[in-house]
Structures are given as C-alpha cells and as structure tokens.
Amino acid sequence: MRTRRIVATLAALATAVLMSMGLAPEACAQAQINTKKMKIGDFPEKIMKVVLTGNPMIDSVLQDEISSGWRISPYEFCTVEDFEANKGNSEFYFMLLSKAQFKKEDAPGIEFLTVVKGGKGADKGIDEMLEACTFPVRAAQMPSGREFDFLPYIIGAMQGYIQKSMTDDRVGYAGLGKYAAGLGGTAGKKVVFASGDVSKNLPETVKEKALAAGIEIVDDDEADELLGTGDMNCIVSYTVAPSNPEFGSYCYKMLFGAGDHKLYYFRKQSVGRDGDCGFIASEFNKLAAVRR
C-alpha cells in the first residue's frame, strides 16, 4: 500500500509539473517519439512519386538521375494531376519542384526540389505536408541553366540527407548545413568558384589571398565543365538566387565535390539592400585558413 501511495504521489507531481508547463501528460510522451527521424522512418517502405513537370529538359534529368542512382526507397514517376489526386494519401512520398516566396519578396524568387509525405492537410498546400528534404535548385524566373549540371549533385545530396535524417535528429532538424561535410573537408583539394557565385563586393586583396591558397575564380562555364571530369580532388561552387535579388530575398551557397558528388558546404544568406549575394570575404578566408 505504501509503495502504491508513493507511486501515485509521484505521478500526481509529474502531472502537476506538466500542467504548469501547459502540457498534458500525453503530449510529453508524443514529444519523445514524434521526432523527425520517427516521422520519416517509414520512408524506405513507401513509394516516392517523382512528379514530372512537363518540361522535357528538366524531366529528362530527373528521370535519368532517379533511375540510375536512387536507392533508399521504391519510386515511380507521375504527372502533376496524379500528385493532386494522391497527395492526401500517406502511403506515398512525393518529390516535386515548387517555387517559394519569402515574406518580404514581391514574387517567388527561387525554385526548390522538395520531398514531402502525403497525408491530411495536403489540400492546404505543400507547406502543410511533412517535409523530408527541400533543396534550392534555380531561380524561379529566368534561371541560368546551370541547374542541369548540378541537379545530379542535388539529388545525391538530398538522398544522403534523408538517409541521415532517419538516424540522426540533429541533422534532421539542423538542416543541410549540418549535413554538409564542412569546409575542413576541402583541405588538400582544389576549390573552384564560378565568378557568378562570388559577391561583387569581394575585395581584390581577398581574391589574391585565395589564389595564393590554391582557390580559383573562373568563368561559370569553365567551372561547370569541371563537374564532368570526375576529379575526386576538385570542388566546385554553386549559388542559387533570384534573377533579380532584392532586400528580403535569400540566396543559397554550396560547394560540391566534382568526383565524389559530396556536399561540402551549404549556407542560406539574406540579400542585402544593395542586392548583393554570393560567397563573401569571410568564407574565402575560412577556406584559405584550412590550407595553411
């Protein structure tokens, strides 16, 4: 009897503490199990429907890359109409391109490749669906065309991120920046920046120091050609930003391994009042530092 009274007292105290925090006891239990890795833990068993856009160029790349390299779940290709008909079905995940508009933007600036789970609330929009991964791909208006070269790398990074998120909530919640290998992983490798990925305000002195450290800045086409070499010791930059960056927009800066397809760096940056975006002096200095 005394033991039962002690247990009952402890339970009452625990309930009181939870209630004082505005939480019901069952909410505490849910908080322990409903983490991202639990929510997407069924990903390997579900079919991922890859939603084709109707654009032959982008659809061809999507089909080729998914068919040749997607390995963490079964998949099939579908139309936008199929997505609309099945988005409420929790038996499916969906990979699709979608444009996003940030709060201070006048119009959507960037197009993302996202993987979401079907289910309740899907009729309210993609933002209400459970997200497994979202990756910036290109400008929403007048994209550069570089996305076709980088899409295989993006899909590879998304696959790796989803797989890691199923075992490590720190990565799942912290995002792609946490998943990336980090600038330290670039030591001993050649890093090549496309000139269009670099801030227009980058001081010449920083460029000179970068060059001395073995970091190159070349034309966009020259940088992108390195992707096809398969060079395991080469890393290439990619920046996704609106075609006309404005204050309140964002850009995304990335470094990919040309040969290993690894994501070495990922960072989201707000666009300043002057519309400038791209890799800045502090990032070049950090890259140079790991080479000393």
Task: Tell where the protein language model's regions lie, with residue ranges.
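N-terminal secretory signal peptides that target proteins for export/translocation
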Residues: 1-7
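Sec-dependent N-terminal signal peptides
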Residues: 7-16
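C-terminal segment of classical bacterial N-terminal signal peptides
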Residues: 16-27
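Start-of-domain marker
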Residues: 28-112
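C-terminal/domain-edge helix-coil "capping" segments
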Residues: 30-41, 122-292
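Aromatic/basic-lined ligand-recognition segments
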Residues: 108-127
